[in-house]
Amino acid sequence: MKHKTWFALVFLLACLNGSGQSKVEKKDLMLPEVLTSNQGKRIRNAKMWIKKRRPEILQLFEDNLYGQVPKEVDSIRFNLKKEEHMAMNGKAKLKEIQIDVYRNKQSVTINLLLFIPANTSKPAPVFLLINHRGKDNTDPTRTLKSEFWPAEEVIARGYAIAAFHVSDVAIDHKETYHEGVLRLYPEQMTMGNGMKTIGAWAWGASRVMDYFEKDRDIDRSKVAVVGHSRGGKAALWAGAQDQRFATVISNDAGEAGAALSRHLIGETILDINTNFPHWFCDNYKKFNSNINALPIDQHMLIALMAPRAVYVASASEDKWADPVGEFLSLKYAEPVFNLFNLKPLPAPTQPAVNVPVKSSNLGYHLRTGIHNLTLYDWERFMDFISVPVK
């Protein structure tokens, strides 16, 4: 409690001084070293990172936080249920795709919505939203429109936009979450590092990626996976363990998402495991009251995306998600991107509200307002992926 109070005081004083970022140094946070192997060996180049350290860190996240994401399936089928060539008054083509995945005589169906710009002669880059909110946010008829998934605005910029609902793979409820994809992998339920809800949603995003690889209208080399809040946690994990995603976008993902757990602002490991015991693997609960025993922190998750592109978005009034901790995760992941000769963010400290910053492969903004996914956020995401990745 003393540590929590001290960090909160530092954060408050920093805000009063006109800066959103606390002055806590990396050494004060006692973060695990991202460029030191489990055997204590320093990682000095990209080859060492890819061969040695990246697999270690991925395994640590599987074993201690998200659980393993099973890869094996008996079969997967893609069925185009509907195709409308004059969607959005002729500005887009709509596809509704049914993705059926089979294993152990069980199956799960993911219903994918996909809008593609009509005025393009080449495969389109696509944003994939992991939607954990109401399905009315992704209304395919466009009778209902939502900034949470602003399909018209994205199409107007020349990008495709897609979404699936998380309930197709795992219902977000502690009593029924296992009734989806986990029927295909019942062995996960009894394992300390078994996949739970967040891992299941990431698994679903990868099955959508399987489909994108088959659709000639989509540029499979330019797929951005997007998630807000708990969906942001899933997007980050999907991007970490599935390197086919070219860009990973986290919006207000907070604890066990983009925010450093050791920053001790807002939601804690104990909070999240108490309120949402079905989200993460059982092993994560070991760290409820012993955070410094956790061999990872979220800067290491973001580092797993290197050399691909990562964007983190925060909201000024969303203290529960710890905007400063989210920014610091990006900053402390930069040494890994440096191994690939990629430039750091052009901001040593958290930027001012509504002043986005980006390099070729890293981006961040702090939006005015509450915990939400808005058109302002989407506009910044589109600006970001328009930057050539070097």
Q: Could you describe each region identified by the protein language model?
A:
Residues K122, V126-D215, S261-R262:
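Cap/lid segment of the alpha/beta-hydrolase catalytic domain
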Residues S250-L301, E326-T349, P356:
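Mobile cap/lid helix-loop segments that gate and shape the active-site cleft of serine hydrolases
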Residues A87-T141:
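Glycine-rich active-site/cofactor-binding loop and its immediate structural neighborhood
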Residues R367, L375-K390:
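Catalytic active-site module of serine/aspartate enzymes centered on a nucleophile-bearing elbow/loop
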Residues A306-A321, R367-T368:
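Conserved strand-to-loop "acid loop" that flanks and positions the catalytic carboxylate
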Residues G20-N111, S386-V389:
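N-terminal targeting or regulatory segments adjacent to alpha/beta-hydrolase or S9 domains
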Residues G134, T138-P140, S206-E267, N290:
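Primarily recognizes the serine-hydrolase "nucleophile elbow" in alpha/beta-hydrolase
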Residues M1-K23:
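Bacterial Sec-dependent N-terminal signal peptides
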